[in-house]
């Protein structure tokens, strides 16, 4: 049976957008751990649009500086712009359009009383194996991270990287890599060394050339790489994007909680699925279910876990400036 998973680097414009939003949230939380934050980002060429709602006592400061600092952390800095020229974003030319307002009073009246910021259904997953995620996703991420770190040190390779792994049963059938190159570079042996085995097929830059990249080649928008952020095809995706929100938002905190519960309840099962739901303005969870699979036998157990947002926020340190790091790591990169 063939199984395929994809991974993308934070140099990909969609993930760059996620990272910028998460970075700005970190700067706000440093001043105001109780801030309410929901900011979407669009990045195209050298223009960044920020739109959403923020309620905080923090001073936002110069948003353009925050955006440039986030880009620099990713690797889009002055050195990178000098090497790549017209082929990549230039942080010195960044223009920021600010369309940020304040949170709706209708939402605030529930959230301020320790209620969830939205309704929704949330899914957590864990399985046996490295990272407690499906092997094809683990390998796609491992290869992506290795290529990204290599590119950060290179004068020839770019950081907008996509990797895709197809397993046939448990053997690596195909490894696909898209990575910007100023001149051709054979990465075959590097791919094999990272994966620990030789795939039947290795495809690097399938179009033959890949130079224009990042927001110069592709418009990036927050929340568009959820299959990569979550569990690929191993299970349904719950809620919406977690990356543009503070911890009062169920899309973030209950997806984190569902993943942790799945890891905790995996035990000696082959797979564990956790399903949670929320109601806006209420602090109890309307429903919860744990499904486990072991040797083909499926078991179900109701889960009663009326966890308030404040309880989970404190337990997982979600009132700390950890969001950019979490965005890079992904929800399914969490194990405890």
What are these regions (language model features)?
Residues 8, 12-17, 114-129, 211-235, ...:
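Conserved phosphate/anionic-ligand binding catalytic regions in large, soluble enzymes, centered on
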Residues 38-57:
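Short, charge-patterned binding micro-sites
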Residues 44, 268-336:
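Internal helix-turn-beta structural module
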Residues 37-39, 159-167, 201-204, 270-281:
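A short glycine-rich, hydrophobically flanked beta-strand micro-motif that places a catalytic Asp/Glu
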Residues 21-22, 56, 121, 210-271:
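Conserved mixed alpha/beta catalytic, RNA-binding, or beta-rich assembly cores of soluble enzyme
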Residues 1-38:
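N-terminal, positively charged regions that mediate nucleic acid binding
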Residues 4, 45-47, 58, 69-213, ...:
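Glycine-rich, mobile lid/loop segments that gate access to catalytic sites or pores
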Residues 9-12, 127-134, 181-186, 241-252:
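Short histidine-centered catalytic/ligand-binding loop motif
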